[in-house]
C-alpha cells in the first residue's frame, strides 16, 4: 500500500478527516476527541499510547548560548508553567473551561482528554525510564545506533525548586 504522511496543524485534523482530505490521523488530545466528535461513527480509534507505561514527557530544549544569555527568562518561563500547572490542579473545572475555549471541545471532552495527562514540572526517574524505553524501541527498529545515558543530557538547574 502507498502511504503518504502529511503534516497538518492539529486544529485542522478533525475537519481534514470529515472532508476526507486524509484517511487517518495521529495526534494527542484534545485533537483525537475533537476528530471523533466531528466525524462520529465514520472514524474509529485503533489504539492509543495510554497503556505503554510511559509518561512521554514534553522536554524543553535550549542551547548553551540561550542558557547563558537568557537564563533568567527561561527561569521565568518555567515558573509560569509551574504556576499554570498548580492552577489546573487547584481549579480543574475553570482550567478546563479556559482550555475548551481554545480547543473547540466541550468542557466535558476537554476534561476527558486532559485527564489523561500529568500536570507537573520536573524530571524524575519515571521520565528517565520513559525516554529510555522509547530509545530502546528506536534501537530495536534500528532508527538509532545506541542509547545514551539520558541524564548526561539533562540540566535541571532552571527548574523551580531545583
Residue spans for each PLM region:
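Short, solvent-exposed polar/charged micro-motifs at secondary-structure junctions
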Residues: 15-17, 57, 121, 157-162
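Secondary-structure end/capping motifs
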Residues: 68-144
